[in-house]
């Protein structure tokens, strides 16, 4: 019995997580965050309908991303999903809900009604033939700026000064160093641009890039991302880039760095502040 007494669902223990891989093994690679939870690299929870032969599951990353996979016609599971997502204690101020099939997209529309919006996303994978330009870009840093790989100190500094959500993505600085990596450009010890592993799974790393507003459009994002990609290549990791279909600046940077779009997919997004949703949809020209 879990979360308000739903007696037909079970939350898995961490050493049981791999039981759900069969439910989305053939799904697209954009489920990086889900594999990261299953593989124990990043924190999260997993719920199933049957611990002997599960037919569907909900994977919850501490970052706010969720995945539903398996049988979309399971009425008991769908009731649980609505119940779980309706409780504020089960998420922060928002959630992202991903799916393993087109059937799930329609079912989620039905379950959540008008409580979430459907977004179009683009997934990019890096083209290995672009390595020579990546290496050149990574050594073009202007004087007075420093390019560094993140260590525990820089990770904690980033969490405290730039993006506190990384404390949910990674349980500690040491866990980040153990399972993830990142690069940053500094000037006088202060962050200018940072490229991190947002999510990781075996052999893949999903990129997160942030550049301070006053330093944008000056090439810093290109340089720090190039260093990140070069490290991936040397370590046998495939870099991934995931963004909203309407985010033209992100798509432009991805293509400049040598990423190719390999998938267009849909997911659902909910935020407790409807103005946040409205402004977001306007910003990225989403109807």
Language-model features, listed with the residues they occupy:
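Acyl-donor-binding surface of acyltransferase catalytic domains
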Residues: 1-5, 44, 50-154
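Short amphipathic alpha-helix that is part of the acyltransferase structural core
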Residues: 4-30, 130-171, 281-287
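Active-site rim helix/loop that mediates acceptor-substrate recognition in acyltransferases
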Residues: 29-42, 161-182
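Conserved beta-hairpin
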Residues: 43-60, 181-195
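Conserved acetyl-CoA-binding loop-helix of GNAT-fold acetyltransferases
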Residues: 75-84, 217-231, 252-256
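Conserved active-site alpha-helix within GNAT-family acetyltransferase domains
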Residues: 103-116, 222, 245-263
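Conserved catalytic-core motifs of GNAT/GCN5-like acyltransferases
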Residues: 117-129, 260-276, 284-285
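A conserved beta-strand-loop-helix scaffold within acyl/acetyltransferase catalytic domains
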Residues: 171-212
